[in-house]
Amino acid sequence: MKTPGFDTYDPWSGEQRPLYLAPMAGVSDLPYRLLAKECGADITITEFTNSTALSREATASWRKMESDPREQPFIPQIFGGEMEDMVTAATMLEESADVIDLNFGCPAPKVTNICAGAALMGEPQRLVTMVENIVDAVNVPVTAKTVSYTHLTLPTKA
C-alpha cells in the first residue's frame, strides 16, 4: 500500500491535530487548496467530483483533480451511485492520490437523485459493497465522508 506521507491511524490530540480544509463544491480548486496550505492547512481535499464523469475522462471533471507537489498529501474526493464508475475513477486516481475520499454525505438533490452521496446511507449493504470493491481495487488508503440522515427524505435505487 502506498504511504500517504502522514500516519492515517495515529491518534491526534490537542495541538497535534491536523488542520483540514474541508472540500467545498465550486470552491476547492487547486489555487484555493494551495493558498490554504500556505495559510497553515495540513490537509486539503478536492471538491467532490462525479465518478462517472471521471471514468468517461470528462476534461472539466479532471480539471478538478489537478494537484501540485506542494499539496501533500493529495486527497481527491469522488461521489457516484454506480459501483463500476466509482471503482474505475478510484483506480484512475490511484497513481496520483495519497488517499481517496468517498463522498456519502452530500444531501443535494442533484446528487441524491442519482442515488449517490447521502442517498447511499439509506442502502447500507450497497454502500458497504461499494467501499469494499474500491478498497480491494486500490493500493492507497480510502476514507469516507458520511452524514447522519435520519431527518432527510432520500430516494433509493429501484
What do these predicted regions represent?
Residues 2-9, 13, 24-96:
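Glycine-rich, positively charged N-terminal anion/phosphate-binding segment
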Residues 50, 80, 106-108, 148:
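Active-site-proximal loop/turn and secondary-structure-junction residues that shape catalytic pockets
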Residues 51, 114-125, 129, 152:
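Conserved non-cysteine loop/helix-boundary elements of the Radical SAM core domain that shape
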Residues 151-158:
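Single conserved hydrophobic/aromatic residue that forms the stacking wall/gate
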